[in-house]
């Protein structure tokens, strides 16, 4: 196999604009100058074409392109023989496929844009893998022959014979109401029309949909839509169940309940596949894990299956021992939560807020007085609908301190690029070198700085919103769900960015967060919200991380232990020996190594 094939050229469809440039890539290419057609592009073309067989990998076109549309990537080892799918010339390609096993839950872990959703489409039979031959795709017989000798051969044979029924819970649940055009639009009508798994009542109980059965789907909130989507899939009989990010929008209690619903679908003959960015939920759900690595929206590679603990640790470590390959320059680590006490001595200013009762329609929130100091992060913990966002808004309205708030839902209305938005809203911070290196650079804002705000994806918008919130000059930062839409890697980076910024600028932050790993990483103290969601809730005064988490987890009836290698929190399986020991001792949350 020639060496040139281990290199791929990617041309971004969004950025490449031959009409607006002088074809610098073609003019500067040394291979074109020798008379070979390595780069073909004319002002009338939609996109440039780069021949990967002729390309010598000099990287001149990458530097010359005025729009930064070209990337030349040297692949690790020779993966050319293992291409599963490629969309078109100079576009994303996926290597290998995850191997589902009957009667077990397969978890997929990897960053955004690395091919997890593509892999799900292929395994569900909704897309035929073209083995990299996008111009001359193979037929199914050839695909099955290609996978011979692996566990996927039997799987694809069933797909070809139409013996397999696959159901996917989509990633973006907020698109569901638009897809439902006619007929009964109520929750119960839509689920009952398809339900054939004899578990309707049980699933309704576990997903807390009993009170919403007569409501129209168009009137559901994000968390309710997520539970509806999980229930709609779980009440149908199928051979393959696929859940794409089943925990977004849900609070910690609902995440664990959803996890139990998904695990209840297992039978000896069916397959369950889950894509999840909340690592503690993925850990709780899966029996084994495939890690995906590569360069987002350029290429993705699926590893062999690992045990859950080993797979997640490999992803965090950035190094695959079986392939002797490092795919990330540094490991993602967790500090121990009690190591935060080093900075307590420096805290000077103390602020207090009074007892207060807020009533909004049927909902009543009783706030107990409390206080906070500077250089401190307080995480608000509680179920959805217990008034965490209401508390943030009340703080913003009734305090003399300057407050910057990142709302829970981000609806962009700004006409223009990200750069224009930053220069308009947070000019001083954006032009400050320290803010650039501590906030913008780690959140990789550079990659999207010249894109239109209205065209950004959920994760990109979230990163822009975090930058905007931290860039405003304020005494108190209220950040509502900073982890939504971010992948596991970005979540850890975002929590490090927020923590470093708050401590260095000696400000206070109140953060609402449902991702357990992120909440424990960020919190110095916690405020617990208890009571009946949407009816009557109570906001307790701030308490230490250990006592707060212990009380919170006791209400959820869940215990956590720490992984000895990476120190990340792991959920104990319900009623396991460890679970019972910790409950008897009253230790629901562990801090020691």
From Swiss-Prot:
Gene Ontology biological-process annotations: cytoplasmic translational initiation; ribosomal large subunit biogenesis; rRNA processing; translational initiation; translational termination
Record key words, sorted: ATP-binding, Cytoplasm, Initiation factor, Nucleotide-binding, Nucleus, Protein biosynthesis, Repeat, Ribosome biogenesis, rRNA processing, Transport
SUPFAM superfamilies, A to Z: 4Fe-4S ferredoxins (SSF54862), P-loop containing nucleoside triphosphate hydrolases (SSF52540)
Gene Ontology cellular-component annotations: cytosol; nucleus
Highest taxon listed in the record's lineage: Eukaryota
Domain 4Fe-4S ferredoxin-type span(s) in chain numbering: 7-39, 46-75
UniProt main location, coarse: cytoplasm
A Pfam family recorded for this sequence: Fer4_RLI
Domain ABC transporter: 70-318, 334-556
Binding-site residues, ATP: 110-117, 382-389
GO molecular function: ATP binding; ATP hydrolysis activity; iron ion binding; iron-sulfur cluster binding; ribosomal small subunit binding; translation initiation factor activity
Keyword Cytoplasm tagged: yes
Protein location: Cytoplasm; Nucleus
PROSITE patterns from the UniProt entry: 4FE4S_FER_1 (PS00198), 4FE4S_FER_2 (PS51379), ABC_TRANSPORTER_1 (PS00211), ABC_TRANSPORTER_2 (PS50893)
Role summary: Component of the multifactor complex (MFC) involved in translation initiation. Required for the binding of MFC to the 40S ribosome. Required for the processing and nuclear export of the 60S and 40S ribosomal subunits.
Oligomeric form and interacting partners: Component of the multifactor complex (MFC). The complex associates with pre-initiation complexes.
Family annotation (NCBIfam families): PRK13409.1 (NF009945)
UniProt similarity note: Belongs to the ABC transporter superfamily.
Protein's recorded name: Translation initiation factor rli1
Naturally occurring in which organism (per UniProt): Schizosaccharomyces pombe (strain 972 / ATCC 24843)
